[in-house]
Amino acid sequence: MKDAVKKYWAVALMFLMVTAVCLLFSCRKSGMFIDEIYTYGLSNSSYAPYITDIKGGNALGQVITREELFDYVAVTEGEGFDFGSVYYNQAMDVHPPLYYWLFNAVSSLVPGTFSKWTGLALDYVIYMLALLCLYKLVKELFGSRDIACAAVILYGLSLLGLSTMLMIRMYVLLTMLSLLLAYLIARLLRDFRPRLCPLVGLTILAGLMTQYYFVFYAFFLCGAYVLYVLGKKEYKKLLHFVPWALGGALCLLLAFPDCIHQLTADKLVSGGNAMENLTNLSQYPQRLLYYFGEVRHGLKAAILVTMVALLALVLLFKKVKTAAGEKSLCLDSLVVILPAFVTLPVVAILSPVLDQRYIYNIVPFFVVAVCLLLYWLRLALEGRERSALISKAVLLAIAALALWQARCVPPAYLYPEYRDYDALVEQHADEPCVYFTDNYFSPMTQDLLQLLHFEDFYVTDENGCGEMLDYLGDCGEFVAYIDISETWSSGYDPEEIIANIRDNTDYDKAELLYQNGLSATYVIAK
């Protein structure tokens, strides 16, 4: 027992620190991004991918009740573990179904519940598995428990890492599977065993069944491994590896044939859009600068460690050179590291919108690159008096730096402003609510958390001011949500909608309650 404590106390401490920070920010999460609400709806609704499908695809002129909204995002009695519905919903969407199956399974364990904690609990478990894969990967590559712990804390408490966990979406699973694939490749690098090749194939299939962007890192990683093996002229290894890797990718067509339509569709999130971005050379600089900036901002602690490590390596160059003549520099770790650096510009160019989530799965490998520098430093210091103590001191200093970064810059997807939105809406929860849109589900999905405050709401378009009067009855005021996004939905001008209401009804006063992305919310009164 004492030996176990001595060996693993640092490992346990790093994971506990990450857990504590994850819990802290989970408690602070006050709202959800629209895609997070899609996660609940696509996973838990019964053969109704989007809110408008609650009303057969056309919500105009209809009333949507709180119960119908709740049924869209929660597993209700008798609907648990309905994986067929999840498969159908994802076939209608733009992503494969693996994460949504897991989400539905977790939601089915707590039927009748709609809470951020359902998604955060699942994401936390997957995040811990991702950190475990990262730990095992670095330990396999560099043979140092302390360096592996440094990787866990540098990534686990990074802005990008915590954002991955806090976004209730498939990206945390995508990251875990990318790390698992890298770990399997690392195992093959160090001790090739044919029985690992089927696991490579299964991991590739699982990654593609999670998010199509898995293909980029997986392709470059497998390609780097093949080139490495060819360089060593160990051709027999490829007879085991290549069929399983290709088979895993091709099995996607059997497991989810709708992927063909999704990848070739002419939508914003599709293969068609990716090809448009590829041919639009003028946007390359903007896209590359954005994503490089996200990495620089989201891995500040790792970058600081890199700068210090490089300076130390320059000062200790002679000792590193001497150590390199006696021990391996672990340059084969570049098989795992370099594909991430190649994937970054590819994703930057092809991503449907500029958003950090598209690079979440490759972020850990930038930390692995930092660990390579730490390994070289370890070689230079090895054999010195109290080298083990120095190693632990460096690890604790890195942990303190990572904690400082997490304290200074909060991760994404917390939405503190949603507390104010909820408070404002709650003041008017007893009043009628009207949603103005051209039957677009996106803005209503974004506003679902606030719409749940109302008993029901009426959906109409810009010309439906007269038709809504039957719904409003003789009330003195009502809440109006106006769909304002020109990119994602109707793009209404609120002033025109309000003027139309004044011209066709007795309601002549309007006060802006708040504005949130795709919609503006007003209180309309007589």
Regions found by a protein language model. Give the residues of each.
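Signature aromatic-anchored transmembrane alpha helix within multi-pass, membrane-resident enzymes
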Residues: 13-16, 374-407
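Perimembrane helix-loop-helix junctions
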Residues: 182-199, 204, 216-249, 458
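Specific aromatic-rich, kink-prone transmembrane helix
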Residues: 105, 133-136, 153-157, 161, ...
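Membrane-interface helix-loop-helix junctions at transmembrane boundaries of multi-pass membrane enzymes
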Residues: 3-8, 135, 139-141, 145-146, ...
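Transmembrane-helix motifs of polytopic, lipid-linked glycan transferases
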Residues: 118-142, 180
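Hydrophobic/aromatic-rich transmembrane helices and adjacent perimembrane loops
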Residues: 337-338, 349-382
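Interfacial juxtamembrane loops and adjacent helix segments
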Residues: 44-95, 107-112
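Transmembrane alpha-helix segments characteristic
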Residues: 149-151, 199, 204, 242-250, ...
